[in-house]
Amino acid sequence: MKFSRFIPRSRTPGLPAYGEQEPNTFENGYRPSPPPGAITPYLGLRSRLSQIWFNRWTILLLLILARVLVAIGSLDGNLVSAKREALSACSSVESVGSTMASMPHYMAQGVNELTATGVEKAINGLMSMLELTVTGVEEIFVFFVNVMTQTYLCLITLVVSGMMNAAIDVLKKATEFLDDITGKLGNAIGDGISDFEDAINGFGDVINMFGTKLPKLNLDGPIKELENLSLPDGLTDDLNKLKEKIPNFEDVNNFTNNALRMPFELVKKLIRDEIDDYKFDRSVFPVPAKEQLQFCNEEGGIHSFFNKLASLTSTAKKIFIGVLVVSAILVCIPMAYREMRAWRGMKERSSLVRREAHDPMDVVYIVSRPFASAAGLKAATWFSGHRRQVLARWVVAYVTSPPALFLLSLGVAGLFSCACQAMLLTAVKKEVPSLTEQVGQFADKVFFALNNASEQWAVGTNRVIDDTNDDINQKVFGWVNQTTGSVNNTLNVFVDETSNVLNRTFGGTILYEPIKDVLHCLIGLKIEGVQKALTWVSVHAKVDFPNLANDTFSLRTLEKLSKDNDSNADSFLMNPGDKTTDKISEVVQRVTDSVESGIRTEAIISAVIISIWFAVLLMAIVRALTLWYGADKNRGDGSGDSEFPHPETLSRDAAGFSDIPLATPTHVSPGMADTSVPVYTTRPPAQAFNGGYNAEDYYQEQKLGFAGQRELRRDVEGHARKSSYGEVEYTNDVKR
């Protein structure tokens, strides 16, 4: 390739002959190092430092900042769209919630009518049943009382009458027996007394002879009275009168029947009067008002959530701008320090090259890539053997070439950008649970409003039902209580009247207490049992319509209904929080998923780019390993003639180019040793083909710049450095 074809001399006035720039040279022919501030064709330290502000790392950081700002802008747009969709979804949920919370309003009228009709039918049926029950109880009660009274009173009458008749008969027979026995006894006594009187009288006559006069004994009068002794005729008169006075209890029975039937008939009359005109008042039932829920626009709702996210992204944007811009500015400091060290290192390497370089291409590489070459030299120290050290340096040079480093830096910058976006996305995701919690509270508000309306309606309706219970208990079962009281009073009157009759009949006689005990045993105990039963009826005779539950219109009741209608139903009623949460938070989740997908894609691309760099590294290592165990060659030992010999002749320009010093010596004082760089020349071209030299070895040595196969030659006399646009030509390899 001829450089003169692309850069003619006449068109490059900025590149005169190097020796013509300044005529002053050292005695060895080398141009001295230019003084500070001098004009040079290459960039000096100040020129390099003037370009620090757009170094590669600053540019990469600014590119990362630009990508992050683009991502934040896209996220802001997505959040605005998500806010709009979330508000739309919230409005629909708000409408559904308002409708559900207003459900008691729509259902109350029908339920009130149903309740009123049920109460009317229940009361009418109750009245009819009560009338029939009262009639049945009346007849049963009267029959029971009549059975007891008539049976037991007839028994008492039988017993008393039999006893009276027996007593009168006994008295009559006793009178007859007494009359008969007293007459006979009087006659016998009279006969015995007559003989005794005669004896006594004779004895008295004897006594009288002695001057004492004895009275005569005469018992005719007492004996006559004894003979006439008998029971009085009026002894049975009282018993006959008592027999005639024994009652048949007909009056008691009639009085008792009338007294027993009177309260029952009164109750039946009142029941008939109430049945005919009873109508339940529907207007007393409450009707809940409609509910209009407002939770989408309230404080702490969706607006607050998205405003918080917008503030978060704005803060993140400011932080990224501040951090990355400051980092881009601060990175100029180490880059400036790096340039200064690189400048000093380049100057040091120039002297090092003059002393120790083996290959002009190696010299150019060391000077142009100081850090990569330093890393290669450091890596080469880990191995022994010249060949392996060269291969280690070659691997480092291969993976730190500008294209490879650009590939690596591009991948690292992409990953760093993904990391920045991931931090922002993580901050956004942390706020999503708060939205889920807020949205879950929407359902709680609907549930609370519905429960509140249901509870208010139930309280009002239950109050009406309780008033109806009280009214029925006072009007109907109050009569029942009066009836039971009247029946109890009637029974008491019956007992009292019966006791009075017995008292008037048997009072003061020996039969009063036995008859009273018999009455208590046969009738009194039964009447006491009936009175206890009537008292129990009076205490428990009341109606109690059941109250409505407070959650009649609540979500639990509606949930049960929905489950009964559809066992697989998946509705807002069955799980009010989840559906609302899914419907609104899904919008935010979709945005975060979209951003996360973009970050994942960028991270994959960056990882692929970095993996390509690692693949390049692997290729370099594999290539180096294929040449790792070759034999080392001594310096200048080409192992005979090359298979592809160098050209025998070079043009004048090319020959001149081979004589150009590789660096300009520094300023030295006269008398100091010459430290100019040695001049490199190649071995004389071989004219014969060495059959023992492998073409593959030649190809590999050519790729490595024929390291170790050149002889070092130092010119003894100085010469003036000449500028040349020489042409470099190779027979088999042309580099463009």
From Swiss-Prot:
Record region (Disordered): 1-33, 717-736
InterPro entries linked: PRM1
Coiled-coil annotated residue ranges, if any: none
Keywords: Cell membrane, Conjugation, Glycoprotein, Membrane, Transmembrane, Transmembrane helix
Location in or out of the cell: Cell membrane
Gene Ontology terms: cellular component: mating projection tip; plasma membrane
UniProt topology in membrane: Multi-pass membrane protein
Extracellular side: 1-56, 161-315, 417-601
Residue spans crossing the bilayer: 57-77, 140-160, 316-336, 396-416, 602-622
Cytoplasmic side: 78-139, 337-395, 623-736
Carbohydrate attachment residues: 228, 254, 452, 481, 488, 503, 550, 565
Any one GO biological process: plasma membrane fusion involved in cytogamy
Family membership noted in the UniProt record: Belongs to the PRM1 family.
Role of this protein: Involved in cell fusion during mating by stabilizing the plasma membrane fusion event.
Protein name listed in UniProt: Plasma membrane fusion protein PRM1
Lineage of producing organism: Eukaryota, Fungi, Dikarya, Ascomycota, Pezizomycotina
Gene, per the UniProt record: PRM1
